[in-house]
């Protein structure tokens, strides 16, 4: 059903030529609409830069200021539920501005990484390998569509749950607009601006995930090639050595791909790790003490979206670390015992490099892994415990 509207989420037949960079089709289109890339036609370069500047000022700077001014000017008019709904999204929004800026600045690095993917694609000549690439490209595009549906569901449900009560969903300040007398005008302005911010946040969350999906695709292909080394009888030692050298080159390209993206994702995941515990804690307090059924559904969707910002990516990073060990095992278990000295010396050097796991870090401080993610999520329960022990919820009611 979805593939009728989004054809790139369906695995393409082998008769069509698919590149690894095609996994970013939908993501790149949305990033282009925000001014995070470059125009295809250079004649529109100035217009595109002006648009990019406008969007950056509006969403990265003016939107957080609008929320902050509303807290200062009308803090006494907030109910406890309104305040928690606003602050949990507001805190996430401040972090989103930093993440979006880092992602936008990482455009050249992402293009550099895609060039490494193009080189890796040249090695995929047999149907079996091309099928794996096609499958992962479709998976990458599906990840974007899945996240888009999830984030849109939160945006719509949160907006409707509040507007039915004639309450502002996010409480933003607009000059010369009375939020009570011009309720629907201000509400529509809120959902439009908040929608832009949500979809920017979506791009920063999906970009690392799709990138690692494609990285794991080529790691899987390399594992298969390592298992098949010296498996074809009748070839010369020089041909076997060239086959091993090609695998060394593939591994170098994978490392170059990850290294190009390392600085881009380090900052975005670091910001998200800092926020996830606080944001989830505020959301849990909102559900436990202040939410109605309609607002509770919106908060649950919000918590799901926040969890999706780190959990799948951390899980993939763990799998890639395991894949590195499996690559070393695959090489060691290949038929190398009867090889000549040149082949064995190259194999020993390559085996040493394969045993070094691919580890990404958040801000150069936290290793990006499931363990780190769980440690950060535990902060949410700490926030809830503090609120319960000091009876803060009752004081707000």
UniProtKB/Swiss-Prot annotation:
Changing residue 196 to L: In strain: LA116. GO terms for molecular function: ionotropic olfactory receptor activity; odorant binding; olfactory receptor activity. It is a multi-pass membrane protein. GO terms for cellular component: dendrite; dendrite membrane; membrane; plasma membrane. Changing residue 25 to I: In strain: LA116, MA13, MA18, MA43, MA45, MA48, MA50, MA7, MA74, MA8, MW25, MW27, MW29, MW3, MW32, MW37, MW44, MW46, MW56, MW6, MW7, MW9, NC21a, NC52a, NC62a, NC73a and NC79b. The chain crosses the membrane at residues 50-70, 86-105, 144-164, 195-215, 269-289, 296-316, 348-368. Changing residue 214 to M: In strain: LA116, MA45, MA50, MW37, MW6 and MW9. Changing residue 38 to E: In strain: NC21a, NC52a, NC62a, NC73a and NC79b. Changing residue 140 to A: In strain: LA9. Changing residue 3 to G: In strain: MA7. GO terms for biological process: detection of chemical stimulus involved in sensory perception of smell; sensory perception of smell; signal transduction. Changing residue 278 to V: In strain: LA108 and LA120. Expressed with Orco in 20-22 sensory neurons on the medial-proximal edge of the antenna. This expression pattern matches the distribution of the large sensilla basiconica. Expression is first seen at 60 hours APF in a subset of cells restricted to a subregion of the developing antenna. Expression continues throughout antennal development. Expressed in the ab3A neuron which responds to ethyl butyrate. Disulfide bonds: none annotated. Keywords: Cell membrane, Membrane, Olfaction, Receptor, Sensory transduction, Transducer, Transmembrane, Transmembrane helix. Residues 1-49, 106-143, 216-268, 317-347 are cytoplasmic. It is found in: Cell membrane. Changing residue 256 to N: In strain: MW44. Changing residue 167 to V: In strain: MA45, MA50, MW37, MW6 and MW9. Changing residue 313 to S: In strain: NC16a. It holds the Pfam family 7tm_6. Changing residue 47 to P: In strain: LA116. Belongs to the insect chemoreceptor superfamily. Heteromeric odorant receptor channel (TC 1.A.69) family. Or2a subfamily. PANTHER family: ODORANT RECEPTOR, ODORANT RECEPTOR 19A-RELATED. The atypical heteromeric and topological design of the odorant receptors appears to be an insect-specific solution for odor recognition, making the OR/Orco complex an attractive target for the development of highly selective insect repellents to disrupt olfactory-mediated host-seeking behaviors of insect disease vectors. Odor-evoked OR currents are independent of known G-protein-coupled second messenger pathways. This is Odorant receptor 22b. The lineage of its organism: Eukaryota, Metazoa, Ecdysozoa, Arthropoda, Hexapoda. The gene is Or22b.
């Amino acid at each position: 059903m979805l593939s009728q509207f989004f054809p790139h989420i369906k695995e393409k037949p082998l008769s069509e030529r698919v590149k690894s960079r095609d996994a970013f089709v939908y993501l790149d289109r949305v990033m282009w609409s925000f001014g995070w890339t470059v125009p295809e036609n250079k004649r529109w370069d100035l217009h595109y830069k002006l648009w990019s500047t406008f969007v950056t000022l509006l969403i990265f700077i003016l939107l957080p200021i609008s929320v902050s001014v509303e807290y200062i000017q009308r803090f006494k008019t907030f109910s406890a539920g309104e305040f928690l709904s606003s602050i949990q999204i507001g805190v996430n929004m401040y972090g989103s501005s930093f993440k979006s800026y880092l992602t936008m600045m990482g455009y050249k690095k992402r293009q550099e990484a895609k060039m490494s993917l193009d080189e890796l694609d040249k090695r995929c000549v047999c149907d079996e390998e091309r099928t794996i690439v096609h499958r992962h490209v479709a998976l990458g595009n599906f990840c974007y569509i899945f996240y888009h549906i999830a984030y849109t569901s939160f945006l719509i449900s949160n907006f409707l749950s509040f507007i039915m009560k004639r309450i502002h969903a996010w409480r933003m300040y607009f000059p010369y607009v009375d939020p009570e007398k011009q309720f629907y005008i201000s509400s529509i302005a809120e959902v439009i601006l908040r929608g832009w911010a949500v979809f920017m946040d979506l791009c920063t969350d999906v970009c690392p995930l799709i990138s690692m999906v494609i990285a794991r695709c080529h790691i899987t292909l390399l594992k298969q090639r390592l298992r098949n080394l010296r498996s074809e009888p009748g070839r010369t030692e020089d041909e076997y050595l060239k086959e091993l050298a090609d695998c060394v080159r593939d591994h170098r390209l994978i490392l170059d791909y990850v290294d190009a993206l390392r600085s881009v994702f380090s900052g975005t995941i670091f910001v998200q790790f800092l926020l996830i515990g606080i944001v989830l804690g505020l959301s849990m307090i909102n559900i436990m003490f202040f939410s109605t059924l309609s607002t509770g559904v919106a908060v649950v969707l919000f918590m799901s979206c926040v969890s999706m910002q780190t959990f799948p990516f951390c899980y993939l990073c763990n799998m890639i670390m395991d894949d590195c060990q499996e690559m070393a095992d695959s090489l060691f278990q290949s038929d190398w015992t009867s090889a000549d000295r040149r082949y064995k010396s190259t194999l020993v050097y390559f085996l040493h490099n394969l045993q070094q796991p691919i580890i990404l870090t958040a801000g150069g401080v936290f290793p990006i892994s499931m363990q780190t993610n769980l440690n950060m999520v535990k902060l949410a329960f700490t926030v809830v415990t503090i609120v319960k022990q000091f009876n803060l919820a009752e004081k707000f009611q």
